[in-house]
């Protein structure tokens, strides 16, 4: 899911922000196009000890570079006051991040990773996000209680910013222009055979995965960087 080159298309841009002070404040820029189904993570940055003024200036500068269609930020806790202050002071339209059903949306995001519909532009600065994705795990103690909560000793700020802005991206509205084969045609039977083979392979992989889930770590974002 790492891409070395971006497609030559007209992108729509959006920004996700996860607010912090002692913890990192993370900024994640994504782009998508009307002509392709993929969403691309274009730019990632993280900073500690940023004031609301610092954050507002950073967002304003990024907006000048990308001309965002959407800007979303975590408004939990004091975040709502910070976002309202920045929006007024810097004339920004910052939307509250959608945070309900986080685990369900992480699963959907993982699905997009596995399908190749979510790509990360392979740059040095974006390694900040990749490191989080590779290390972030669910808290096993919470899992025994039936709750999906990330381990508190794992960084998740860039991941959260990505999740916020991915939920706002419109790439999922893209409809493929390829035609489905006619029912009963040779192409249809070939497609069905390929589906059956993929299902059989997935079962084998799933059996191995179940063993790993029982005996190994419990990653939040899995099988995404193949």
Identify the meaning behind each predicted range.
Residues 23, 55, 157-161:
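Catalytic-loop motifs flanking and including active-site residues across diverse enzymes
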Residues 147-184:
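Acidic, Mg2+-coordinating catalytic module of metal-dependent nucleases/exonucleases
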Residues 35-147, 172, 189-226:
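Mg2+-dependent endonuclease catalytic cores in nucleic-acid-processing enzymes, primarily RNase H-like
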Residues 1-17, 223:
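ATPase catalytic-site recognition across NTP-hydrolyzing enzymes
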């Amino acid at each position: 899911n790492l891409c070395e080159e971006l497609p030559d298309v007209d992108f729509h841009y959006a920004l996700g922000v996860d607010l912090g002070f002692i913890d990192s404040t993370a900024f994640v820029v994504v782009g998508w196009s009307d002509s392709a189904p993929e969403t691309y993570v274009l730019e990632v940055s993280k900073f500690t000890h940023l004031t609301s003024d610092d954050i507002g200036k950073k967002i304003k500068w990024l907006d000048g570079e990308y001309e965002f269609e959407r800007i979303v930020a975590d408004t939990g806790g004091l975040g709502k006051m910070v976002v309202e202050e920045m929006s007024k002071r810097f004339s920004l339209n910052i939307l509250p991040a959608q945070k309900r059903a986080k685990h369900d949306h992480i699963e959907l995001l993982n699905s997009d990773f596995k399908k190749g519909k979510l790509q990360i532009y392979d740059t040095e600065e974006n390694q900040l996000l990749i490191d989080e994705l590779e290390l972030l795990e669910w808290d096993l103690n919470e899992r025994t209680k039936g709750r999906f909560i990330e381990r508190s000793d794992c960084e998740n700020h860039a991941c959260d910013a990505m999740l916020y802005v991915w939920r706002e991206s419109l790439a999922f509205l893209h409809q493929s222009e390829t035609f489905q084969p006619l029912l009963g045609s040779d192409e249809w039977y070939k497609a069905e055979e390929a589906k059956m083979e993929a299902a059989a392979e997935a079962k084998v992989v799933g059996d191995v995965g179940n063993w790993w889930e029982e005996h190994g770590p419990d990653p939040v974002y899995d099988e995404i960087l193949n």
